[in-house]
UniProtKB/Swiss-Prot annotation:
GO terms for molecular function: transmembrane signaling receptor activity. It comes from Rattus norvegicus (Rat). Receptor for Dickkopf proteins. Cooperates with DKK1/2 to inhibit Wnt/beta-catenin signaling by promoting the endocytosis of Wnt receptors LRP5 and LRP6. In the absence of DKK1, potentiates Wnt-beta-catenin signaling by maintaining LRP5 or LRP6 at the cell membrane. Can trigger apoptosis in a Wnt-independent manner and this apoptotic activity is inhibited upon binding of the ligand DKK1. Plays a role in limb development; attenuates Wnt signaling in the developing limb to allow normal limb patterning and can also negatively regulate bone formation. This is Kremen protein 1. PROSITE patterns: CUB, KRINGLE_1, KRINGLE_2, WSC. Disulfide bonds join 32-114, 55-95, 84-109, 122-186, 147-167, 151-169, 190-198, 214-240.
Length: 473
């Protein structure tokens, strides 16, 4: 046995090595929800993003078994393209290549985005210590779900498969400590299902044991819920409940990325988590829409299967949405002028008219004038180039008052003159007494001259008001 000092040095070195090794980064958004990528419909056309080989077009591979001539209706995702696909149910997407290696004319595609949720990746296993240090077993009928179910029954969080027949369990958070490997290095087929990948030699493929569980509780903003026993076919006589409760969510968006239920007696239901009222029901005859929303923050997912038929099941992706409370709109900054006017006639009017142009505007140096029943208006620049100030309104009002006063004065003057004329006529009648004709002429003539002079005196307003208008100077 090594001395304590040596053991301490070894532990310190191991700790430093572990701390220096970065944990796996965030996975890209999943483009696959099956274990073997049979549902991949992406656009990668190389066997690997770095150092890969270009794929051949599926409509040019007539010498090979899979081409658009044999599958003209897009079966398996084939078409007039060279994207990686998995039309034959292999362990991962692949494509034909032009360069043959030892008579092999196709290659698997390394697609980072084609990794089903719950698949934690492919990692190196040097065996000292292994990535998962819990219990283990081997089986010549091993599948992904048989290993996951075994580890879940032992209350482990992670399940790993190697070489197609070995199953490892554990709770080790540092399962990645020996390094991550390419997904194509874990493509050894499972002994119990040749369409599923079960690791490789010295390579372990890891899964979360929640995958394929019959029931569970979810509270995250987004997750994927699989049917029981997924990716294997679901068993008969299953009754499972999953609660999806996201406090504060205004709605939950559901998307069934996989739905393979062939029996009308097998069903999937969504229930109101508070009242247990059935919201929607889907079965072999009534398939779910592409996506839909439920305006609740608590939903129960229910699955039932009878004792007759089996199928792959379902994978449903949910995404909760929280609507933030409306924020108060900040005060509008009044430093920029907003001019709303007819630009077509503005320049012509400004060049040939002296009228004042009014525009909607706001300026820190000229506070807006409030006019009842309208916007805040400020006079703009006229044709003369001088700004009409705000007091122009008061000048116009004063001019209007003076005009009204002048009109009223003129009316009063006219009434006064009429009354004086009536009085003069009466005096003339009183003066027409018997006498000579020359005296009558003199009396008649003098008032006429006097009245004319009186009018001039009224315009000049230089005489006393109490004088008789018929008396001349």
């Amino acid at each position: 046995m090594a001395p304590p000092a040596a053991r301490l040095a070894l532990l310190s070195a191991a700790a430093l090595t572990l701390a220096a090794r970065p944990a796996p980064g965030p996975r890209p958004s999943p483009e696959c929800f099956t274990a073997n990528g049979a549902d991949y419909r992406g656009t990668q056309s190389w066997t690997a993003l770095q150092g890969g080989k270009p794929c051949l077009f599926w409509n040019e591979t007539f010498q090979h078994p899979y081409n658009t001539l044999k599958y003209p209706n897009g079966e398996g995702g084939l078409g007039e393209h060279n994207y990686c696909r998995n039309p034959d149910g292999d362990v991962s997407p692949w494509c034909y290549v032009a360069e043959h290696e030892d008579g092999v004319y196709w290659k698997y595609c390394e697609i980072p985005a084609c990794q089903m949720p719950g698949n934690l990746g492919c990692y190196k296993d040097h065996g000292n210590p292994p990535p998962l240090t819990g219990t283990s077993k081997t089986s010549n009928k091993l599948t992904i779900q048989t290993c996951i179910s075994f580890c879940r029954s032992q209350r482990f969080k992670f399940a790993g498969m190697e070489s197609g027949y070995a199953c490892f369990c554990g709770n080790n958070p540092d399962y990645w400590k020996h390094g991550e490997a390419a997904s194509t290095e874990c493509n050894n087929v499972c002994f119990g299902d040749h369409t599923q990948p079960c690791g490789g030699d010295g390579r372990i493929i890891l899964f979360d044991t929640l995958v394929g569980a019959c029931g569970g509780n979810y509270s995250s903003m987004a997750a994927v819920v699989y049917s029981p026993d997924f990716p294997d076919t679901y068993a008969t006589g299953r009754v499972c409940y999953w609660t999806i409760r996201v406090p504060g969510a205004s709605r939950i968006h559901f998307n069934f990325t996989i739905f393979d239920i062939r029996d009308s007696a097998d069903m999937v239901e969504l229930l109101d988590g508070y009242t247990h009222r059935v919201l929607v029901r889907f079965d072999g005859r009534s398939r779910p829409p592409l996506s839909f929303n439920v305006s609740l923050d608590f939903v129960i997912l229910y699955f039932f299967s009878d004792r007759i038929n089996q199928a792959q099941g379902f994978a449903v992706l949910y995404q909760a949405t929280k609507e933030e409370p409306p924020q108060e709109r900040p005060a509008i900054n009044q430093t920029l002028a907003e001019v709303i006017t007819e630009q077509a006639n503005l320049s012509v009017s400004a060049a040939h008219s002296s009228k004042v142009l009014y525009v909607i505007t706001s300026s820190p140096s000229h506070p807006p004038q409030t006019v009842p029943g309208s916007h805040s208006w400020v006079p703009s620049v006229g044709a003369s180039g001088h700004r009409v100030e705000g007091w122009t309104v008061y000048g116009l009002a004063t001019l209007l008052i003076l005009t009204v006063t002048a009109v009223v004065a003129k009316i009063l003057l006219h009434v006064t003159f009429k009354s004086h004329r009536v009085t003069a006529s009466g005096d003339l009648r009183d003066c027409r007494q018997p006498g000579t004709s020359g005296e009558i002429w003199t009396i008649f003539y003098e008032p006429s001259t006097t009245i004319s002079i009186f009018k001039k005196k009224l315009k000049g307003q230089s005489q006393q008001d109490d004088r008789n208008p018929l008396v001349s100077d």
